[in-house]
């Protein structure tokens, strides 16, 4: 990190294409990465990586066979609406999720919303990090930018 102007922490992909259904970036795991990073990297160089996507798993999950579909945050909400699914919020992971049935198959979806991103913004402030960076930034998620504008001075 001495040679870097800034470091980007990849704090996501806990829930991933070939893994079991879970939050993409559960807050306790994100915090543990930041806890370690600040012991090795000056905080003014650290950008917290934030996912701008989610995954849709078909259940039951079978390791080595199952493959989740990568979806955008807006797409996740659209799927929930289309199937009348209730979006729940995991208080530990600080992440939204829901299940739905399509063609007789149960699906489980985990994604990011303003509540989960707000929790990650809290870590940026708490640790005094330089800022944040996004994976899959080109996926439209206007609510993120509105939240960001309300919480940070953007340059």
Annotated model-derived regions:
Residues 30-38, 121, 146-151:
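Generic structural signal for well-ordered alpha-helices
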Residues 16-21, 56-61, 141-146:
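Extracytoplasmic/secreted cell-surface and envelope-processing proteins
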Residues 50-123, 149-155:
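Glycan-binding loop/region signatures in secreted carbohydrate-active enzymes
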Residues 44, 130:
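Short acidic/polar active-site loop segments enriched in Thr and Asp
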Residues 7, 48, 124, 132:
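Conserved, mostly hydrophobic/aromatic
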Residues 9-14, 49-55, 111-114, 135-138:
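Active-site-proximal beta-strand/loop segments in catalytic clefts of secreted hydrolases
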Residues 2-5:
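Short, small-residue-biased leader/transition segments that mark boundaries at the very start
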Residues 18-24, 106-110:
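Second-shell loop/turn segments in exported
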